[in-house]
């Protein structure tokens, strides 16, 4: 096929001239293959690079139900760009999806990522994917594929967006849906590692108002590192707990905080009453509240306030659950109880 005729001095165009560097994409794949290889587990068929990623459901499941989740990192990325810190957002990406599917009792099996940018910086992208692979290792799932989209003009230089997709499996008879939660059950709170990945639009507004020195020491590390601490992944300790005692319900404390996420697992007619004095409010949340003048109710509705996962068990199992999770390295508190709802009352109240 002959190219169309053009002006005598015009040169032929390439994809690189249009802003897409295929060689950079190939270099990225070579850089990230070792990271993905470290996440391999039983069930993975083939490696990265195929048109589709293949995974065989483990034979230990008699009636496997697949559970899927997808999420991003939100405007925490804007802070990552400002700080030029890209090594933690990959774990955030994995955590947001695997913690979500864990809530229904699912074991995460595999993960795929989507990385979109205007101009591909191979080193930055590789750093992000290394974090994704680390998150997959922490949750026992395989990084089996993904997409890197270089789209000139779509994103400002130095910026990118992320999306993640997790698929897990749970035995049909062991799906956790909150249907067995009853009056008198105990709500346990597992400590968060920080803000996690929700509420960063408000965080950034507070930073804009307070104009702090982000490199200054904040309780033993820089304020920047404290703000960017990666989302905690609760998969392995909670999967182990489920093997030992009945977990009636779980809530991943994301956007909406405690007051909007716990109701998602409660039957109509039940309320979780939480005691805000039952666990310590971490210094970072105190700092945000003070410098932003944020009301208590708004704090509980936007941030996790130190609790990244809520677990509901019977009162008889509460102490054993706390002991098991503590032995696994989690900080756990009894933060509330389940009772009958009062007329016109929300399904989660903080007192």
Swiss-Prot record:
Q: Keyword Ligase: yes or no?
A: yes
Q: What are the GO cellular component annotations?
A: cytosol
Q: Which InterPro entries match?
A: PurM-like_C_dom, PurM-like_C_sf, PurM-like_N, PurM-like_N_sf, PurM_cligase
Instruction: Tell me its EC number(s), please.
Output: 6.3.3.1
Q: Which UniProt keywords apply?
A: ATP-binding, Cytoplasm, Ligase, Nucleotide-binding, Purine biosynthesis
Family membership: Belongs to the AIR synthase family.
Full protein name = Phosphoribosylformylglycinamidine cyclo-ligase
């Amino acid at each position: 096929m002959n190219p169309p005729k053009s002006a005598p001095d015009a040169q032929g165009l390439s994809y690189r001239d249009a802003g897409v560097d295929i060689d950079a994409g190939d270099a990225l794949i070579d850089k990230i293959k070792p990271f993905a290889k470290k996440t391999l587990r039983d069930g993975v068929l083939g490696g990265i690079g195929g048109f589709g990623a293949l995974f065989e459901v483990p034979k230990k499941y008699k009636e496997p139900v697949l559970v899927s989740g997808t999420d991003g990192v939100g405007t925490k990325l804007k802070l990552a760009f400002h700080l030029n810190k890209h090594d933690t957002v990959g774990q955030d990406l994995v955590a947001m999806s695997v913690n979500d599917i864990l809530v229904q009792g699912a074991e995460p099996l595999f993960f795929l990522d989507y990385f979109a940018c205007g101009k591909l910086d191979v080193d930055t992208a590789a750093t992000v994917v290394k974090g994704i692979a680390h998150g997959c290792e922490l949750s026992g799932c395989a990084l089996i594929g993904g997409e890197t989209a270089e789209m000139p003009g779509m994103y400002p230089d130095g910026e990118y967006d992320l999306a993640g997709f997790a698929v897990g499996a749970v035995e049909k008879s062991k799906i956790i849906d909150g249907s067995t939660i009853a009056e008198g059950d105990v709500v346990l709170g597992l400590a968060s590692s920080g803000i996690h990945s929700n509420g960063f639009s408000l965080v950034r507004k507070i930073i804009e108002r307070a104009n702090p020195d982000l490199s200054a020491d904040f309780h033993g590390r820089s304020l920047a590192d404290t703000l960017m601490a990666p989302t905690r992944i609760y998969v392995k300790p909670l999967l182990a707990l489920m093997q030992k005692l009945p977990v009636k319900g779980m809530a991943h404390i994301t956007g909406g905080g405690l007051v909007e996420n716990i109701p998602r697992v409660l039957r109509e007619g039940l309320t979780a009453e939480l005691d805000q004095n039952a666990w310590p409010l971490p210094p970072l949340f105190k700092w945000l509240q003070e410098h932003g003048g944020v009301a208590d109710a708004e704090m509980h509705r936007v941030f996790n306030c130190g609790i990244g996962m809520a677990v509901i068990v019977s009162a008889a199992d509460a102490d054993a659950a706390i002991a098991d999770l503590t032995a696994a390295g989690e900080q756990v508190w009894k933060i509330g109880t389940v009772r009958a709802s009062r007329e016109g009352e929300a399904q989660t109240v903080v007192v």
